[in-house]
Regions:
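Solenoid-repeat scaffolds in large eukaryotic assemblies
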Residues: 118-120
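Structural register within alpha-helical repeat arrays
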Residues: 99, 105-106, 172, 179
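Alpha-helical adaptor scaffolds
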Residues: 61-74, 127, 154-166
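Boundary/linker segments of alpha-helical solenoid repeat arrays
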Residues: 129-152, 206-216
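Alpha-helical solenoid scaffolds that mediate protein-protein interactions
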Residues: 77-88, 125-134, 199, 206
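Extended ligand-binding clefts on enzyme/binding-domain cores
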Residues: 1-101, 109-114
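Glycine-centered coil turns and helix-coil junctions that link the paired helices
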Residues: 106, 112-113, 129-132
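Long C-terminal extensions of eukaryotic subunits of large macromolecular complexes
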Residues: 66, 157-287
Length: 288
């Protein structure tokens, strides 16, 4: 419990928790005059892994467990980096470099999971600690005083994909929507809402860059968001019907669809099964 309170919450069915435990035992028992950096590293590196993949989510339809982000571990991970940097002046710069990269990920993933206020908190911390450091790889102008939180997150999505061509952007939007549908089917509402909101933001950014010129819009513009959402939903449900029918049924229930909506062997869904609004909407999972 002591280790979990200080470095967690940890998922003790995953190896990172045990690595952190034994390294913390080593810190307690070693002579303070010894080089403790290997032990400190053996704590903050697994803590970073625990943040990225330290939560188990049960998929009752496939009877498997999946690893997800452990966002609740972010506060203690942040604290550990800062304390270790203070305790070890020799390796301070090394630890703070790792801390800087951790903060970028924390901002991004908190926002992606619809924990906007927490994301803003760490964005502010980054701005205070690293005001002259770029948030985006390869863009030295993306310092926190020159890029807004929303803008950083959308740019980070595109950075992760590595391309912002129309086909690639469409793939990003559809991928985010499918992630939203999957999370919603597993009752992971926070994730579902976050993915849907991100899909809207990416679509809006690309659409606003092309809709001023009709010829450009016709040539490389994206379809309306609701059309993309409906197509992504159709593809997701039809694939799930083949591979995980119980998951597909769960999503239909969460979205208020009929039991045969979007089934491959059935005719097109009735009007009541279609999204009502033509405008992007992602505030609630029911709109995903």
């Amino acid at each position: 419990k002591k280790v979990d309170d200080k470095f967690g919450p940890l998922e003790w069915r995953l190896p990172e928790a045990h690595a952190i435990y034994w390294a913390s035992v080593g810190l307690e028992k070693c002579d303070p005059k010894d080089d403790l950096m290997p032990l400190r590293r053996a704590i903050y590196q697994p803590m970073l892994l625990s943040f990225h993949r330290g939560r188990l989510v049960e998929n009752p339809f496939s009877k498997t467990y999946e690893v997800r982000c452990n966002l609740d571990a972010i506060p203690n991970t942040d604290k550990a980096y800062r304390e270790f940097a203070e305790q070890d002046p020799e390796y301070r710069d090394h630890i703070l470099k790792a801390h800087k990269n951790f903060l970028k990920d924390a901002i991004y993933f908190l926002y992606s999971y619809n924990r906007i206020s927490e994301s803003a908190k760490y964005f502010k911390e980054f701005a205070e600690l690293y005001p002259d450091q770029a948030l985006l790889t390869g863009d030295p102008t993306s310092t926190p005083d020159k890029i807004a939180l929303d803008e950083f997150v959308v740019e980070r999505v595109e950075e992760d994909i590595g391309d912002n061509s129309p086909d690639r952007v469409r793939g990003i939007v559809e991928g985010l929507l499918e992630s939203s549908f999957y999370s919603l089917a597993l009752d992971q509402e926070e994730e579902a809402t976050g993915y849907a909101a991100m899909a809207v933001k990416v679509w809006k950014k690309f659409d606003s860059a092309t809709n001023d010129d009709k010829s450009v819009q016709e040539r490389i513009g994206l379809p309306p968001f609701q059309s993309m959402r409906e197509e992504a939903l159709r593809q997701f449900l039809q694939l799930a019907d083949e591979n995980e029918p119980l998951l597909a049924d769960a999503l239909r229930v969460r979205l208020g669809l009929s039991a045969d909506a979007y089934k491959r062997t059935e005719p097109a869904p009735e009007e009541g099964d279609r999204p009502e609004s033509s405008e992007p909407a992602a505030e609630t999972p029911q709109n995903q």
